[in-house]
């Protein structure tokens, strides 16, 4: 049984990138779907789609690589964990890695990237960082 579906999904993406796999399959939830939607919008993955197998939903993620065959994801890190939640205000999530990275924040407006959360003027729980 998986206790933390977000950590599991991030680990599956990270491991697939290290093994240079074209796709990986994640367990479905609304938060994971929003998370990979942000990854796609920011250019860290090619695409994703929701599939259903035996009455269970999964998210199929197509990974993205550069011209040398290296994954475009340098680091994918879970910040807030079930045992230690991390919350930040809007002023503390403005930039990450001088604008090259992205912080994914769970806010009252949904799951947002750090720049979108800053524009909306909301803070929240820091789910993960990616660059």
From Swiss-Prot:
GO molecular function, one term: structural constituent of ribosome
Alphabetic keyword roster: Ribonucleoprotein, Ribosomal protein, RNA-binding, rRNA-binding
Gene Ontology BP terms: translation
Single GO cellular component term: ribosome
Matching InterPro entries: Ribosomal_uS8, Ribosomal_uS8_CS, Ribosomal_uS8_sf
Pfam name, any one: Ribosomal_S8
Annotated transmembrane regions: none
Signal sequence, renumbered to the chain: none
Job of this protein: One of the primary rRNA binding proteins, it binds directly to 16S rRNA central domain where it helps coordinate assembly of the platform of the 30S subunit.
Similarity comment: family membership: Belongs to the universal ribosomal protein uS8 family.
Subunit-level organization: Part of the 30S ribosomal subunit. Contacts proteins S5 and S12.
PANTHER family named in the record: 40S RIBOSOMAL PROTEIN S15A (PTHR11758)
Name of protein: Small ribosomal subunit protein uS8
Source organism phylogeny: Bacteria, Pseudomonadati, Campylobacterota, Epsilonproteobacteria, Campylobacterales
């Amino acid at each position: 049984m998986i206790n933390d579906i977000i950590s599991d999904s991030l680990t599956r993406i990270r491991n697939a990138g290290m093994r240079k796999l074209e796709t990986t399959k994640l367990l479905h939830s609304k938060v994971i779907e929003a998370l990979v939607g942000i990854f796609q919008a920011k250019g860290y993955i090619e695409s994703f789609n929701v599939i259903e197998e035996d009455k269970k939903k999964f998210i199929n993620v197509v990974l993205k690589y550069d011209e040398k065959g290296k994954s475009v994801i340098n680091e994918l890190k879970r910040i807030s964990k079930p045992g230690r939640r991390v919350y930040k205000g809007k002023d503390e999530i403005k930039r990450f890695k001088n604008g090259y990275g992205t912080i994914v924040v769970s806010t009252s407006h949904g799951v947002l990237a750090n720049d979108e959360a800053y524009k909306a003027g909301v803070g929240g729980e820091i789910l993960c960082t990616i660059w």
